[in-house]
Amino acid sequence: LSLHDALPICDILLSGYHGENKYKYPIIPDRFPGKGPLGGLEACFRKAKNPYCLVLGVDVPLVPAEELAALIRQSLHSDAKAVILSHGGHEEPLMGVYCTDLADAMLEEITERKGAVFAFLRKNGYECYESQVADWYFSNINDPETYKEIPGNHFIEKYV
């Protein structure tokens, strides 16, 4: 199941990318460079066309689309302005659904304090969606070799 088939995503923004512009999606520069992930979220939320954003790092390509759909479903039934994914007791603040009207609160965090994502979440409130899939789906992958290696270590070939 592809991401576009599983999720009603109509607006994709890239943050934190400093390489050659070779993607069809807009790259949103941080308004306050050097403020980490929260600075990127703040800039993207100001450009977003929708009241909610699904936040997902490019270095976690194995997260199943079905898990993201479940995360979105929980966020739709939540009063929290941020619903982040949790797996095996590990909370992932860069895998979540955020209300874009949090941009002003993010601005305050990055200009008046350190700009830590968890400090922001603790101050503004959040809830967790507890994933039901194995932890390895959330592996941080930054190179093609690791991308090929991780699934191979966890899938059993049916026809050997």
Language-model features and meaning:
Residues V160:
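Cytosolic-facing loops and C-terminal tails of multi-pass membrane proteins
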Residues L1-K114, A119-F138, P144-E157:
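Nucleotide and nucleotide-moiety/phosphate-recognizing core
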